[in-house]
Amino acid sequence: MVNLAEYDFILVAFSGGKDSTAAFLYLLDKGVAPERIELWHHSVDGHGGNGAASSLMDWPSTPAYCKAFARTFQAPLYFSWRLGGLEREMLRNGTATAPISWENPDGSVGTTGGKGPKGTRLKFPQVSADLSTRWCSSYLKIDVGAAAIRNQERFLGKKTLFISGERAEESPCRARYKVFEPDRTCSDRRTVHRYRPVHSWKEQEVWDIIRRHRVNLHPAYRIGFPRLSCRACIFGQEDQWASLRQVDPAGFQTIADYETKFGFTIHRKTAVGDRADAGRPYAGCSDQPLIAEAMDPDWNGPIILPEEEWVIPNGAFGQGGGPS
């Protein structure tokens, strides 16, 4: 049993999805005050203006949803990102990997990196459990979070618990993760432990705690998407690609055009257009107000619903893909 009271900082890697939400709610159930819990959202498309962000991979409503969630529960929220997000990294052609930035508690923004060796990608991350091939997870989430911890002096000489929502049920790869272990940022100068409190949970348990707290999850779940984070996740099944094509035809076409331009597909054998042709759109893909909600960067819906209004979303218990 992890003694939550002994940590100076508790951080939650918060995508806005069901599993990271369940991990946050678990902390509340254990008596941790919400103001002690920092929600860390790694923006896979980058963050901010002036070329710092794209709109290729994630839901436009996600940043606003995360802000509303944090505001409702009165928990601090900090964004972190690689400049230009996945799209800039994917389009690297004889250039260095972009810098990493993060928000500090005083409102300032820290930045590091961007001066590494020059290289070329010109292809999407590939479907693989190998992080060097599936570089989206490492370059846009894992490395970003680690840089934000290593470059903030407030963690030096302190004890930090970094919580993430991976579950064993998701894949054989994630089943091998340890529930509790030293984080990659742990050193003689700072103590950082990684804790996966929902690792052994079945999906039903995730929905049970969300129902009990009456949390209105991200609209993507109501459309029928079984996972959040990247709406254009490279592990998406045929139905997900068919749904994305219906929800955001222009965004889908941009991805298809990149596959043609690169001469490499996301899936090793099949282009996204063919995969979409083989799938069926989710139930909510014909609900235009719901689609508009998911695509709204100024999302302002409620986070807590009346008990009689909470219903399990269309995306529950669906095929979500993920690292094998």
Indicate where each model-derived feature is located.
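Local cysteine-cluster metal-coordination motifs and their immediate loop/turn environment
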Residues: 134-135, 226-239
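Peripheral terminal appendages
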Residues: 1-38, 68-84, 151-154, 182, ...
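Immediate flanking context of iron-sulfur cluster ligation sites
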Residues: 214-227
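Short amphipathic alpha-helical interaction segments
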Residues: 198, 222-225, 247
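ATP-dependent adenylation/nucleotidyltransferase module used to activate substrates
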Residues: 1-213
